[in-house]
Amino acid sequence: YSSAASDVYKRQVIDLGAGNLASQLSWIYYYLKPSFDKVNPLISKRLRHELQVRILDTYMNEDHFWWMAFHLKPGGLVNNWNPWCNFNVLQCFFLLENDRDKLAKAVYRTMTSVDHFINYTHGDGGCEEGPSYWGHAAGKMYDYLQMLSDGTGGKVSIFDQPIIKNMGEYIARSYVGNGWVVNFADASAKGGGDADLIFRYGKATGSPLMMSYAAYLKSLSDKDDIPSGDPFRLFQTLLSREELEGRSADYQSPSYSWYPETEFCYMTNKNGFFVATKGGYNNESHNHNDVGSFSLYLNTMPVFIDAGVGTYTRQTFSSERYSIWTMQSNYHNLPLINGVAQRFGSEYKATEVQFDPKHMYFSANIATAYPEEANVKKWIRSYRLGKNTLKIEDSFSLDRAERPNQINFLTWGKVDISVPGAVTVEVNGEKV
């Protein structure tokens, strides 16, 4: 028991929980201070004091919180915590701080921090964390940027930057249909996003794709649904809902979406095929060892799937993460090479990644995602989408063959192997 440990309780921490609560309390203080003062002035004084000590002072005087990314090392991770926490802090400063010089310094500090999140994200806008995290990643970044623009009278606005638009459109491009979304990494397989948020983001960045997608999502929901969310999103929805409801729901899934830096590729055709493939590396945010994997949807129904993630536990975010089966490459649509699975780490990645939109063809060398003991020189995994077919081809060269290679396919359908040389998979009436 040390003296340092005995002082831990005195330290203030800004995390998701503290930030969410503080931003809500700041709105409460902003609107209800006169009412509190009529009851007892101590209520608002105590509330203002706690917000000052716990959030405003702590944010300006501390720089060790990992999500701030002020001490980011090469290869370090910046995820949704960054825009989410900074958005909460920005609300607190705009609602509470009356000293213009102090406010300016605080706003600039949040801008410097959020820059690290934007710079971490590839220019193509792909969200490594998946669609179910988009609302907390790009979505919270939009909230932050919108409040920053509003709070500065539009003088500080970067909605015209291509990366911001690309980050927004990811949510529309990752939608398969009937509630299904592409769910690489820890993302959920069902979702679609917050229609009101997506519409506002699309309007701010000039994206017809996002606005039509938002109108489509809204057309699927209860027309009498009550706007909800944190105070800022709630107020924004009240201002934009009527415009959203008046927009035509003419969304159509793009024929393909190619993310050359994130190395995500989605291909569709007019016969109901939707193929999602990836290259990438095995240290992405919410990472699975899944370099080169794919999912296939037929008439919006998942056939070959990504199992996603189970309930989060202590094990999920510990050194034991890759002992969980859903994180391992042998439980993705990938090969075991010489009996060896892919390995975790930034150095285990796809190489020679390419996409040909004219021929709907994606390929990657995934040998570089396997450790040395796999004894593989090259393994080109390719996907070619035809009118009524998806051709998956493995072309490889080994240093030596020690064990039979095993090609894995994950499906939740009924598998029929009764016909020699053929395998049929049926999912809710859809057969491949």
Predicted regions and their residues:
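Single conserved hydrophobic/aromatic residue that forms the stacking wall/gate
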Residues: 1-5, 9
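Active-site lining segments of carbohydrate-active enzymes
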Residues: 11-130, 239-248
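Generic, well-ordered alpha-helical scaffold segments in large soluble proteins
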Residues: 24, 92-95, 113, 144-151, ...
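Short alpha-helical "patches" and their helix-cap loops
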Residues: 36-45, 101-108, 151-164, 420-425
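A residue-level signal for conserved active-site and pocket-lining positions in enzyme catalytic cores
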Residues: 89, 171, 394
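Long, repeat-rich segments with strong aromatic
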Residues: 96, 100, 107, 111-152, ...
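Carbohydrate-active enzyme catalytic cores, enriched for enzymes
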Residues: 136-304, 355-357
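Non-catalytic C-terminal accessory modules of carbohydrate-active enzymes
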Residues: 153, 240-431
